[in-house]
Amino acid sequence: MHFLIPAAGSGSRMKAGKNKLLIDLEGESLIYWTLKSVLSANSTNWVGIIGQPKDKNLLLNSAKDFAQKVHWINGGDTRQQSVFNGLEALPKDAKKVLIHDGARCLINPELIDLCAKQLDENEAVILATKVTDTIKIVDKEGFIKETPDRNYLWAAQTPQGFLVDRLKKAHKMAIDKKWKVTDDASLFEILNWKVKIIEGTYSNIKITSPIDLKIAKLFVKNP
């Protein structure tokens, strides 16, 4: 399985002053923990890190021995552009790809393998968890408009997996039509292409704030 890891997070909400994947988690960087999980999956055989050139040496150095097992890909101005760059950099024989947020450093390798396996039967899959909170849709003034049935609500995670040719086609259409999305599954939604949900775990958090880092430390100490 070919694997792409967008790794250009600025860390502004973390107030880190650097790429957030360089932040320390129990003695190792976030990118180290992410690569440890990804490379532990039985299905992983090729990994590309997509980041900004200025961060290349810092990220690869902090990845330690794992750096020798990955390929560096220069990212774009947005996550969407970076993923497209990653797709263009895949080996020509790549048929399937998993895309995973670099800041989700606690992904279970078994879930990676499950996503890879599900791509044998589906053209697109994503990890997600059932929403447990009541969600409100509000208007521009901040007043509640409606409350959707949470039985149909899932919180999207990564990895998200796709057939390479299909995802490339979706990204090229997005460029032509100037679509802006925050994850790759959204492109499939716009095109009315099916995406299969695979239930993930609540421990697969994305490190975006200081409280997330505190939670991640608890999971690392108590796996």
Swiss-Prot record:
The record marks 13, 20 as: Transition state stabilizer. It catalyses: 2-C-methyl-D-erythritol 4-phosphate + CTP + H(+) = 4-CDP-2-C-methyl-D-erythritol + diphosphate. Its EC number is 2.7.7.60. GO terms for biological process: isopentenyl diphosphate biosynthetic process, methylerythritol 4-phosphate pathway. SUPFAM superfamilies: Nucleotide-diphospho-sugar transferases (SSF53448). Transmembrane segments: none annotated. Pfam families: IspD (PF01128). Keywords: Isoprene biosynthesis, Nucleotidyltransferase, Transferase. GO terms for molecular function: 2-C-methyl-D-erythritol 4-phosphate cytidylyltransferase activity. Coiled coil: none annotated. Pathway: Isoprenoid biosynthesis; isopentenyl diphosphate biosynthesis via DXP pathway; isopentenyl diphosphate from 1-deoxy-D-xylulose 5-phosphate: step 2/6. Belongs to the IspD/TarI cytidylyltransferase family. IspD subfamily. Catalyzes the formation of 4-diphosphocytidyl-2-C-methyl-D-erythritol from CTP and 2-C-methyl-D-erythritol 4-phosphate (MEP). This is 2-C-methyl-D-erythritol 4-phosphate cytidylyltransferase. It comes from Prochlorococcus marinus (strain AS9601). The gene is ispD.
